[in-house]
Amino acid sequence: MSPVISHPRPAAARHQFDELSPITITVDCPAKTNLTLEVGPAHDEWGGRHELDTIYCAIGVYDTVTATAKQPGAGFSLELEGAYLGDLASSRSDMRRNHAVLALFAMAQAAEREPDVALTITKRIPVGAGLGGGSADAAATMLAVNRLWELNWPIERLRTIAATLGADMPFCLTGGLAYGTGFGERITDIAPGSRDELALIEQGFSGEVLVGAYQSQLSTPEVYHTFDLVGAAEGDRNHLQAAAISLHPRSGQAIDAATQAGASHAFVSGSGPSVVAFAADEAAAQRIIDVWRDTAVVDRIIRAKSPAHPNIGVRQ
């Protein structure tokens, strides 16, 4: 499913758009989790990245990227907002390494134009949490610039560019549910109402979605390095889970607490440390929330829906 576009510009006005237009594009892009994550061997041709076989699921926790054209030659700017910026708020953070900025540069190079765009990111997705917040920001930037510059490139072309930036960025362009292979960048969408989606629902991947988040962060390379040492635990749908828990034991405690409270599924999200729990109904969701609060095994609880999709808005 393609991103939802709201408030489209009248067709008659499109030819008037140029770099000086005051039009602003806003994209809300959801977090991602991995319902399954099988990790294979590392490949030198992929820069040492591991082979992955995963089922992506976008969940309704959104970062918002706002893009406005600047004067020609003015260059780009980046502003970060939100209460959960993590390391992004550090004065040592290089904005040119921000995922959204890298996505802007990649789009500018592909379009053969200068990246004269003002970006504002409102963060709600926890940082360094295994929820794809940086990938969501990159995907949102690509969708915004595609609209702002009136490129009208199809999703497949955007995914080709996104694959040069990160494993799950191609998925974040559309959200929903999808299979990911290669190093995670090869996307096969799972259509709403399809047999594959119904199978996931029957397995318990439906209802309320709860995210247990932490102030602490995990480095994805460190988690993969630990995985190379300890491997996957038997029965784990996420092969990185044992490695993440060894580095962040509270994640394991949160999984145990959610499971005992009646979660249909509870697991480390991606490389962690966040924990995602699916609850069949409101009562089960409330039990999980209560036990997480009572035992303090998570620092922040986010309630969300899934599957979710990006939303694109246009304002004058």
Curated annotation (Swiss-Prot):
Catalysed reactions, as listed in the record: 4-CDP-2-C-methyl-D-erythritol + ATP = 4-CDP-2-C-methyl-D-erythritol 2-phosphate + ADP + H(+)
Binding site for ATP: P126, V127, G128, A129, G130, L131, G132, G133, G134, S135, A136
InterPro entries: GHMP_kinase_C_dom, GHMP_kinase_C_sf, GHMP_kinase_N_dom, IspE, Ribosomal_Su5_D2-typ_SF, Ribsml_uS5_D2-typ_fold_subgr
Pathway named in the protein's UniProt entry: Isoprenoid biosynthesis; isopentenyl diphosphate biosynthesis via DXP pathway; isopentenyl diphosphate from 1-deoxy-D-xylulose 5-phosphate: step 3/6
Entry keywords, A to Z: ATP-binding, Isoprene biosynthesis, Kinase, Nucleotide-binding, Transferase
A Pfam family per the record: GHMP_kinases_C
Protein name according to UniProt: 4-diphosphocytidyl-2-C-methyl-D-erythritol kinase
